[in-house]
Curated annotation (Swiss-Prot):
One cellular-component annotation, GO: mitochondrial inner membrane
Molecular-function annotations in GO: NADH dehydrogenase (ubiquinone) activity
EC top class, as a word: translocase
Gene name for this UniProt entry: MT-ND3
Keyword tags: Electron transport, Membrane, Mitochondrion, Mitochondrion inner membrane, NAD, Respiratory chain, Translocase, Transmembrane, Transmembrane helix, Transport, Ubiquinone
Residue runs in coiled coils: none
Protein's name according to its UniProt entry: NADH-ubiquinone oxidoreductase chain 3
Organism of this sequence: Reithrodontomys megalotis (Western harvest mouse)
Protein family per UniProt: Belongs to the complex I subunit 3 family.
Length: 115
């Protein structure tokens, strides 16, 4: 019986919120609001605009370090295993390789905007 009451309350609240969401919005559509947002670029111009290679390099660097975080997230669970030294060695090697890559990119001036 309690499960039925909880289900009934949840369905009624969800239905109520959906109905309120349909009644509340103000429909003031004007031309600027109807146009899609194009991140500061003119949406009527060509879609094949050239962009700086610096943005690409920063994006690739971000993806690499994001991948590093994704690989290191399971580390607390891996430490609970019996072979802690192998886990820590693997993590240290991964972080060292990424740090050397970052140092190389820094020395090659890949992270600087002005040249």
């Amino acid at each position: 019986m309690n499960m039925f009451i909880v289900l009934l309350v949840n369905i009624s609240l969800a239905s109520c919120l959906i109905l309120i969401a349909f009644w509340l919005p103000q429909l003031n559509i004007y031309t600027e609001k109807a146009n899609p947002y194009e991140c500061g670029f003119d949406p009527m111009s060509s879609a094949r605009l050239p962009f700086s290679m610096k943005f690409f390099l920063v994006a690739i660097t971000f993806l690499l370090f994001d991948l590093e975080i994704a690989l290191l997230l399971p580390l607390p669970w891996a430490i609970q295993m019996s072979n802690i030294k192998a886990t820590m060695l693997t993590s240290f090697i991964l972080v060292s390789v990424l740090a050397m890559g970052l140092a190389y990119e820094w020395l090659q001036k890949g992270l600087e905007w002005t040249e």
